[in-house]
UniProtKB/Swiss-Prot annotation:
Purpose of the protein: May have roles in cellular differentiation. Ectopic expression induces differentiation of fibroblast into myofibroblast and myofibroblast ameboid migration. Increases retinoic-acid regulation of lipid-droplet biogenesis. May also have neural functions. Promotes axonal regeneration and augments motility of gliomas. Down-regulates the expression of TGFB1 and TGFB2 but not of TGFB3. May play a role in the regulation of alveolar generation.
Induction or repression: Down-regulated in lungs by dexamethasone treatment.
Upper lineage: Eukaryota, Metazoa, Chordata, Craniata, Vertebrata
One cellular-component annotation, GO: cytoplasm
Name assigned to this protein: Neuronal regeneration-related protein
Subcellular location per the Swiss-Prot or TrEMBL entry: Cytoplasm
A single BP term in Gene Ontology: axon regeneration
UniProt source species: Mus musculus
Tissue specificity of this protein: Expressed in brain and fetal lung.
Gene that this sequence comes from: Nrep
Effect of a null allele: Normal heat and mechanical sensitivity, as well as normal formalin-induced inflammatory pain. Reduced formalin-induced avoidance behavior, which reflects pain-related negative emotion, indicating a role in the affective, but not in the sensory component of the pain. Also exhibits altered behavioral responses in learning and memory.
Region named Disordered: 42-68
Amino acid sequence: MVYYPELLVWVSQEPFAYKEMEGGLIKGRLPVPKEVNRKKMEETGAASLTPPGSREFTSPATSYLHPF
């Protein structure tokens, strides 16, 4: 364990120290629309497709290596 005397952290045993803070985390989190999730899934799926004419068993990271 390393001790840094210049760092000071306050730890409270209560989940919310002040009444004003109550519910602050719930208000700050917004639900992500399903359209955004679907778009991300489509982009990652398109990125993992093998280009035409390449061998399917090679990984995309090594697809630039060609046998001579």
